[in-house]
Amino acid sequence: MLADVSSVDAIYIVCGRTDMRKSIDGLCAIIQDQFSMEIDHALFLFCGRKCDRIKAILKEPDGIVMIYKRLTAQGSYRWPRNKSEVRNLTW
């Protein structure tokens, strides 16, 4: 199933600005290099300089999915730029 988040155990917001030109491999490298984590059973969210678009990485049994969302209206995400701005997520 494409982008089935029912098996996700945790959601991680990657603080700061991410180069949104990065592909699946580039975003997976950030997860492994900066956080020493594997991508299994987690959803990782990234935001660039413009806070109107995000990317998500999710591993599924048959591959890795990258989800890209750009807001079409004049709006933006409130994205933490450093660890002091991080808040807990519930869903």
Language-model features: locations:
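Polybasic/polar functional segments that serve as interface/processing modules
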Residues: M1-W91
